[in-house]
Amino acid sequence: MPTAPALGALLLLLGALTPGHQEKLFHSRDHSDLQPSPQHQAELVTDLQSAQQFLSKYGWTEPVKWEGTSSKNAAELPRYGDADLMQEGASISRYGQEFPLEPTQAPAFVEALRKFQTLNGLPATGKLDDSTIAAMNKPRCGVPDNQIGKESAIVKSNSNNVTEKASGKSLNTTTNQNPENGTSTSKIRKKRFLQMLAAPVRYKDQANQGSTVRGAFSKKLLKWRLIGEGYSSQLSIDEQRYVFKTAFRMWSEVMPLDFEEDLTSPMSLIDVKLGFGRGRHLGCTRSFDGSGQEFAHAWFLGDIHFDDDEHFTAPSSDSGISLLKVAVHEIGHVLGLSHIYQTGSIMQPNYIPQEAGFELDWTDRKAIQMLYGTCEGSFDAVFDWIWKERNQYGELVLRYNTYFFRNAWYWLYENRKNRTRYGDPVTVSLGWHGIPAEGIDAFVHVWTWTEDATYFFKGTQYWRYDSENDQAYIKDAQGNQYPRLISEGFPKIPSPINTAFFDRRDQFIYFFKDAHVYAFDVKRNMVANHYPKRIIDVFPAVVRNNHPFGNIDAAYYAYTHNSIFLFKGKEYWKVVSDKDRQQNPKLPRNGLFLKKNISEQWTDICNVHSSMLKMR
């Protein structure tokens, strides 16, 4: 245990307490790749005729009928050895229809070309120049940008304006600021932008019933499978499955849907089927064009096909086309997202090489949440973990990381980015050694002039944690063996408790049990006078009857907000701070402000399916 002078020096550094660096991930998204074996090359856009075909194919001239023309049922798929499975049909145009040999620059063509140029950050000249041809020849998704019966969500890139649809309607939305840090100049503009991203989707069969679909799937668990007829020739089967598992997990980390790989159920019960093919493939009504342009296509509520003529590589490769990035994009289509021309968005139609560590950005996360909602739920414990390190000048500084515990999982929350760490949640047993693997009741950090100790509580016991060695004590310097009974270390505190926290202002631990709270004086090692008391008496409601009353899930002092929070269910109450009372003396001490949803303050804390907790 640190000496009093040492602790005094540490406490002087509290004012400089800063969020900690990102904790190392416990599973990697990076794996080696194999070399490609392309067999066909895509035809390039080179002239007016092929440019007109391109604009028509992807819905720039007029919307394209796409949904409802997906692949056949699995039972109708040809066998793996079928000669047509991996071959390009010579009699079928790569664009699926015929065009005049000498297209004229009709007003519709010129207007479509201008729209395409604008959304690709090119001068809107309406003329087919080299830059426009180069943009058309970039590797891209095969899903049209504008579809019949479906609202598009096309956002102008590198601009201060957000363009609504391909019609050029402007929302005048600022997009060059980072929405994650909450510094957007207009919440109204941001809301309108998000509403545009999640424009209602209406299809023919649903329109007949008068229904408008905002979320593609109504159920919470989706099953997926890489079909046996459609393995890639470039990567091992295990590598392919791992990449797809990672892609589904990345979406699950930011939305309230679970994804599970299912290798045994009848194909009719599989929600999303994935496969590779060349040319005419997998019984699909659409043909792939060979290496160099269209790399995949997908259908709303349906299947995903990848062109095996493309050079697909694993995430760690700096060459070829990242299968992970393409898979994440196509899964977005299956879930209901349209193309988004927005810098950083995974839903851009063109493939853009990504640096290591690619993840879903703010636009993608908020777009999918507009369809499916945000992640909500209760937590077992929430706390800031304080640790010490020396900076580049050799000075001792204190830092903290914020953690959320639920069942057997935990998340590290990056307050500066207002989201969880990429790759979370992970299992408690993987990151916290020697404490119970699930169901933690409380975390307490006792921090005084004479004591610096951290404890985890569960049931009738508690554990002291050794932060230096990153594991629970078996026996501490005072000779105490762990786990200990709560009644031994904290006399007259009942167990099990609901939650607890240490208040540095009065140096009491507040233990919550049902509708009561116990203030424990750590200096005297006893319950404070006149306790227990009703929670509502110690933490009164600022607004009458707006109060948790009892059975608190978690109590948390947040260094980011310099405030105490009480959590119950999906909601939280902020405790009136000394600063709040200085600004408004009428506020009661330790009063509870109006409740709010946890997901409004701490975003994207999402479960993933249990099968995805261990990625390999």
UniProtKB/Swiss-Prot annotation:
Coiled-coil region: none
EC numbers for this chain: 3.4.24.-
Keyword Repeat: yes
Active site, per annotation: 330
PTM note: The precursor is cleaved by a furin endopeptidase.
Cofactor: Zn(2+); Ca(2+)
Cell compartments where the protein resides: Secreted
Function, as annotated: May play a role in gastrulation-related cell movement. Plays a specialized role in the generation of left-right asymmetry during embryogenesis. May act as a negative regulator of the NOTCH-signaling pathway.
The protein, known as: Matrix metalloproteinase-21
Organism this protein belongs to: Cynops pyrrhogaster (Japanese fire-bellied newt)
Organism phylogeny: Eukaryota, Metazoa, Chordata, Craniata, Vertebrata
